[in-house]
């Protein structure tokens, strides 16, 4: 089985390289690949990659994820998040391939306090959400064999993440202010990759699982409580911090070009039932990531 992975060097793409390898022959690209086009600013190029390789499975971990930047470059965000996804969907349909694609809770308006269902009405607050929703719709229209996983608050041990930023600031400052009115579940790239690999195996044997799913860790937190956990674990590990006061503030304290949803909770019952998996609490993955961070690198 040939598996084509786009976006191999991103947070999720990096973990997918590990998780997908046992499933078959993994062919992975990113924007800099030269043998074939992996650059999503070239829709026809990535479609030609699909037609040339003729994979059984396509996993798309490439996206324009700079939420604030998307507000000032909506055409580019649309090109990456929707136009190229449509091109891949059409090419995948031609060669009979499955497409696994990642989307976001930002397709929702972010109000209320109930976890969003796959069937809830969408109403994006920003350009990023609009373009990701357009990508979803294109894939649904042009390639029946698809799995779309909406996720949120994604982190990974590789590269920058919220926890690393908080730890750096807590070493430099005695007081920090963190938002406490946005709710979601920090979800590890490791978890997304492992769930994706399992879902692919299920889909190959049960094609009727094709469709849209919500995929995040269990439980709910705020950025403030997330930060508090990071600092608690750091102190347990003997990491010296200058911080002595953590303040909770509303979203309005940090104005940004793109509006953020207050409610990023996603209901994952459909995913857990269809793929016979249990999604662990968000703290499990975060504590594991922090433990690796504390024991393998200088923060």
Swiss-Prot record:
Cofactor(s) listed: Mg(2+)
Record-level Gene Ontology MF annotations: dTDP-4-dehydrorhamnose reductase activity; metal ion binding
Keyword Magnesium found: yes
Residues the UniProt record annotates as site (Could provide a fine-tuning to achieve optimal pKa matching between active site and substrate): 104
This protein's pathway: Carbohydrate biosynthesis; dTDP-L-rhamnose biosynthesis; Bacterial outer membrane biogenesis; LPS O-antigen biosynthesis
Binding site for NADH: 10-12, 30, 39-40, 63-65, 128, 132
Main EC class the enzyme belongs to: oxidoreductase
Xref: InterPro entries: dTDP_dehydrorham_reduct, NAD(P)-bd_dom_sf, RmlD-like-bd
Swiss-Prot/TrEMBL catalytic activity: dTDP-beta-L-rhamnose + NADP(+) = dTDP-4-dehydro-beta-L-rhamnose + NADPH + H(+)
Keyword annotations of the record: Carbohydrate metabolism, Lipopolysaccharide biosynthesis, Magnesium, Metal-binding, NAD, NADP, Oxidoreductase
Binding site for NADPH: 11-12, 39-40, 63-65, 102, 128, 132
Cofactor: how and how many bound: Binds 1 Mg(2+) ion per monomer.
Active-site residues, Swiss-Prot/TrEMBL: 128
Role description: Involved in the biosynthesis of the dTDP-L-rhamnose which is an important component of lipopolysaccharide (LPS). Catalyzes the reduction of dTDP-6-deoxy-L-lyxo-4-hexulose to yield dTDP-L-rhamnose. RmlD uses NADH and NADPH nearly equally well.
Protein name in the entry: dTDP-4-dehydrorhamnose reductase
UniProt lineage: Bacteria, Pseudomonadati, Pseudomonadota, Gammaproteobacteria, Enterobacterales
């Amino acid at each position: 089985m040939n598996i084509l992975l786009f976006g191999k060097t991103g947070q999720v793409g990096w973990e997918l390289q590990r998780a997908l390898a046992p499933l078959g022959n993994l062919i992975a690209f990113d924007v800099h690949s030269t043998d074939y086009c992996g650059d999503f600013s070239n829709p026809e190029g990535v479609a030609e990659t699909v037609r040339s390789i003729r994979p059984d499975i396509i996993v798309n971990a490439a996206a324009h994820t700079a939420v604030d930047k998307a507000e000032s470059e909506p055409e580019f965000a649309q090109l990456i998040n929707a136009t190229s996804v449509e091109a891949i969907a059409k090419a995948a349909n031609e060669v009979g391939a499955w497409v696994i694609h990642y989307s976001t809770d930002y397709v929702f308006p972010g109000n209320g306090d109930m976890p969003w269902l796959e069937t809830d009405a969408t109403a994006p607050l920003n350009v990023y959400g609009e373009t990701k929703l357009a990508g979803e719709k294109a894939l649904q229209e042009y390639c029946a064999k698809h799995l779309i996983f909406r996720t949120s608050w994604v982190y990974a041990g590789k590269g920058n993440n919220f926890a690393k930023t908080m730890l750096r600031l807590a070493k430099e400052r005695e007081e920090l202010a963190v938002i406490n009115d946005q709710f979601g579940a920090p979800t590890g790239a490791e978890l997304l990759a492992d769930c994706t690999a399992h879902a692919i195996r299920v889909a190959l044997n049960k094609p009727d699982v094709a469709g849209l799913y919500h995929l995040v860790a269990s439980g709910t937190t705020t950025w403030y409580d997330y930060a508090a956990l990071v600092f608690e674990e750091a102190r347990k590990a003997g990491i010296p911090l200058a911080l002595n006061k953590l303040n909770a503030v509303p979203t309005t304290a940090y104005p940004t070009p793109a509006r953020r949803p207050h409610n990023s909770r996603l209901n994952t019952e459909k995913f857990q039932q269809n793929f016979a998996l249990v999604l662990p609490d968000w703290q499990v993955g975060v504590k594991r990531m922090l433990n690796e961070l504390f024991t393998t690198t200088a923060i």
